[in-house]
Amino acid sequence: MDTQMQFRKNINSLRALAVISVVLFHFKIRGFEGGFVGVDIFFVISGFLMTGIIVSGLQKQSFSLLGFYASRARRIIPALLTLCTALLIFGFVYFPLDDYRELIRAIKSSLLFSSNFMFAKSGGYFDAPLHENWLLHTWSLSVEWQFYMIYPVLLMALHKMLGLHKARIALVVLALASLAASVYVTNSNPVFAFYMLPTRAWELIVGGLVFLFPLQIGKRTSLMFEGMGLTAILASILCFSEQDLWPGYLALLPVLGAALVIAANTESAFSTNRALQFSGTLSYSVYLGHWPLVVLLYTCGLLGSWPHVTAGIVLSFVLGALSYYFVESRTRKITTPPRAIFKYASLVVGVVGVSAITSSVVKDHPGIRFAYVDLGQPAYVSKLYEQECFANPYDAAECKLGKGEVSVIIFGDSHAQATAAAVQIENPQASLSWARGGCPTLQHFDMHDKELASQCHGFNADKMNRLKTSYHGVPVVLFSRASLYSDSSRGNSYRIYFPGQEHLAGQAFVDTYTAEYTRTVCSIAENHPVYIVKPIPEMPFSIYKGLNLHKRIFQSTSDISISLNAYEQRNRIAVHAIEAAAKQCNATVIDPTPYLCPNGRCIGSKGGVPLYFDDNHLVDSGNEELKGLFKQVIAPI
């Protein structure tokens, strides 16, 4: 076995392919819908290189665990620290208080290499709210760092106890176990599977196995292997999308593709291309720098603008070059492990400490910042009606809106609470609002968040029972952010499944969801007129944040909207279920899009005024746009 780790041009070109695919995916370039596989490619490369360093050192009896950690710190921390410091300053100038403190939390978790845990608690990688997090991309660095902490110790132990040959077999078993876990957990808990080391470790170990099982092949076979690997990678980029559950078994295609390219180890047009070599050299710094630019354009509503996107891509590589030549290259000169570890640990602790102090200071003294004058976040609680709310064991918003006899019942998730004002402004009497955030209007379902599932089951059962025994003949208006629950491919943190059918997906899931939703609606319709409201349009980002940042940076205001076609595509499954239930249960469908989506655009703001509290909950200004929509619900008095 070759124990000499030399610079490999084919690996450098593979790095370039990985970073280019990720950058173009994040900037929403058509044809790169599967560009997120670039991270999987990076994992394979890291596994190969780290295994080479560790095993070569063990074979020579010269491996130093301290030296290994120092080299990883020297490679990763300086550029990351530079990015975090720049964002700390940028946010100080431009961000509202809550956003700035959220950024500081992300900085701390990123520098402590625990951001994958933080983001896993916030939802799926492809969920819109996380696209506003300036350091979301550091989740992969956290996974790699955690691997770096464990892997050399594991290899040292296996090498000592089993010898190299048996250690290789043990790694094969570990890789297969991690892959099996990834396949299983991707279906049952996709958020965990995406972010966590146990379900990602196999990708890194596969890279290690390429080093441990070197191929002895000729030039022609090497070129064939490289071609097969590149074809697999390109197929992944072109054929996969964020609609696919990831990583799971699908990740085998780019992972094995990357493994083939590395194993081929041949000189070709791919490995000698100067542009790819240059991009590969800059890949880490480009990866770090591109995502904040994506978030900036995303939050300002400019990610669909070709001039801005082009500028963002170019600037990603310019900033990457600056970071590489002025940060990465210079910090590699520190070679003494204790000195390196002490230096980087001190820098990390220093920035984390400064971040924590800054967070506390700006909270108590907002006037010290340039951005302390807030443009005014809209109030979540409506001022269009009086309300009396009641305590309940479900952490739900259970309220009586207005005064007099109850003439309407509003039932659903947080969208029921957020849009209740649109119903109540038509109602001269009172409404009952029953709303529990994150709960689908279903009777028989389950969720991976067992605490939330328990509350949803209790809340729904209680309200369904009350509808059977009370308020007979009173209209019931059903609201729901239905696309959150009805599309099993999204893998968000509110994803539901059905008892005994945990792995149901595709059309089978759609059919089961539609049947369960219809059963719920028909049960209510036995005693009440039922009105089902089609989903409220969801914006791509927080309207308030977008308007605020655009105003501060560009000194101008531009209204935010999405296409009606995008709305229809997102809610296709939900609308299908609603229309099927309405037809079978003799319910009435209410469509908000003629009011919120004039001229083929669904508006998030009007005249610089947000219609939403965030990206999906209407506020008073948005509810007033719906005036007249619910007149049909209110019986004449």
Region locations from a protein language model:
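Membrane-interface helix/loop caps of multi-pass membrane proteins
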Residues: 2-337, 352
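Extracellular/periplasmic envelope-modification machinery, especially enzymes
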Residues: 242, 302-307, 317-321, 325, ...
